[in-house]
């Protein structure tokens, strides 16, 4: 089984285009038009979106790529969560979006944590920042008794994506260290030299997102 890459996409466009995109997903997932691939036998396969627009799916990399969630985020933004083998399948998804409206603008974040793969095209940090942060209670009782669960909730919060400035501010307060450079702090945290879960009960991981223009 290939490593699973999770991709989150926000697609911006005109209200009418977002509605058309939502209809395409609805009709594809339900196989309303009976156009879905019979061999693949999974209506959530992204190749079916291409088939429903009269496009040839095997022109693109659609390997083990499936829609998990989708919907209208608001009148001008559509949301997609998908899983695929190894990496994001944005060439195929771009073809889907272009088939509805070539002026639609997708922003995506792809994560394959086993390979330390964190990639986004969101250069503007509109949806996805410079860093991806995840934390959890490795030892709940210790996290509570040490007071670090409360501090982590207050200073790191439930956010997943941070700009460099936001992250530096949070870590300076969390670690009582306003002087060490951000990259060095992140290295120490990920190596468990700083904020060690054996002392805090909290497992904290910080990953820099590679920004691409494609």
Residue ranges: model-predicted function:
Residues 1-214:
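Intrinsic low-complexity, intrinsically disordered or marginally ordered coil/linker segments
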């Amino acid at each position: 089984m290939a490593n699973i890459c999770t991709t989150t996409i926000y697609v911006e466009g005109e209200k009418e285009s977002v509605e058309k995109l939502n209809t395409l997903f609805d009709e594809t997932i339900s196989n309303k038009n009976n156009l879905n691939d019979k061999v693949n036998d999974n209506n959530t396969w992204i190749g079916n979106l291409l088939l429903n627009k009269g496009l040839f799916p095997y022109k693109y990399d659609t390997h083990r790529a499936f829609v998990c969630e989708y919907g209208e985020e608001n009148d001008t933004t559509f949301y997609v969560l998908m899983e695929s083998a190894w990496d994001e399948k944005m060439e195929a998804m771009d073809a889907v979006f272009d088939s509805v409206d070539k002026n639609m603008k997708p922003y995506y974040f792809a994560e394959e944590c086993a390979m330390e793969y964190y990639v986004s095209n969101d250069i503007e940090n509109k949806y996805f920042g410079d860093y991806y942060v995840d934390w959890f209670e490795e030892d709940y009782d210790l996290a509570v008794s040490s007071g670090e669960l409360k501090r982590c909730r207050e200073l790191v919060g439930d956010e997943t994506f941070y700009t460099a400035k936001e992250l530096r501010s949070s870590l300076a307060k969390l670690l009582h260290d306003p002087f060490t450079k951000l990259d060095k702090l992140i290295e120490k945290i990920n190596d468990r030299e700083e904020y060690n879960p054996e002392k805090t009960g909290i497992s904290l991981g910080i990953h820099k997102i590679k920004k691409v223009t494609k």
